[in-house]
Swiss-Prot record:
Note: Present with 1240 molecules/cell in log phase SD medium.
InterPro entries named in the record: Fmp46 (IPR012882), Thioredoxin-like_sf (IPR036249)
Organism annotation: Saccharomyces cerevisiae (strain ATCC 204508 / S288c)
Primary enzyme class: oxidoreductase
UniProt gene name: FMP46
Keywords per UniProt: Mitochondrion, Oxidoreductase, Transit peptide
GO annotation, cellular component aspect: mitochondrion
One protein family per Pfam: DUF1687
Name this protein carries in UniProt: Putative redox protein FMP46, mitochondrial
Highest taxon above the source species: Eukaryota
General function of this protein: Putative mitochondrial redox protein which could be involved in the reduction of small toxic molecules.
EC nos: 1.-.-.-
Length: 133
């Protein structure tokens, strides 16, 4: 946890990117695990918009599993990474991204920003976030 958040006793934020939590089994399992943690060490943010250019770059370069997780979630990742940071794709509703083939509706994407963790699997949430002391 960052020094500033520690002083303020604020939990870190974990984002779950999903186009439709109701129809995505992996996203449902991820959310269930995250919400089931009673330690209050983190807040859960449900993101239904495509990551911003900055977020995408952070996940890709700062998180060890970033490139693999992003490739599973964003089928056209190589093309998207070439877009200008002002491209309307960044911040676009994920449902539109699914329709355009830019977002895999069967995957989940979660990000623990502070600990530089990113993944697609619910089991990794348990392994890297819930069990982490």
């Amino acid at each position: 946890m960052s020094f500033w958040k520690t002083l303020q006793r604020q939990p870190r934020t974990i984002s779950l990117f999903t186009n439709d939590i109701a129809s995505n089994i992996k996203s449902q399992k991820c959310l269930q695990l995250l919400k089931g943690d009673v330690s209050h060490r983190f807040d859960v943010e449900i993101a239904n918009r495509f990551p911003t250019w900055d977020q995408l770059q952070y996940m890709r370069t700062s998180c060890p599993q970033g490139p693999v997780s992003l490739q599973r979630q964003i089928p056209k990742l190589d093309s998207v990474l070439k877009y200008k940071h002002t491209d309307p794709t960044f911040g676009m509703d994920l449902q539109k991204c699914v329709q355009r083939g830019l977002w895999n509706p069967k995957e989940a994407l979660w990000v623990d920003w502070e600990n530089k963790l990113v993944g697609n699997e619910p089991a990794d949430i348990d392994k890297y976030i819930i069990q982490r002391k």
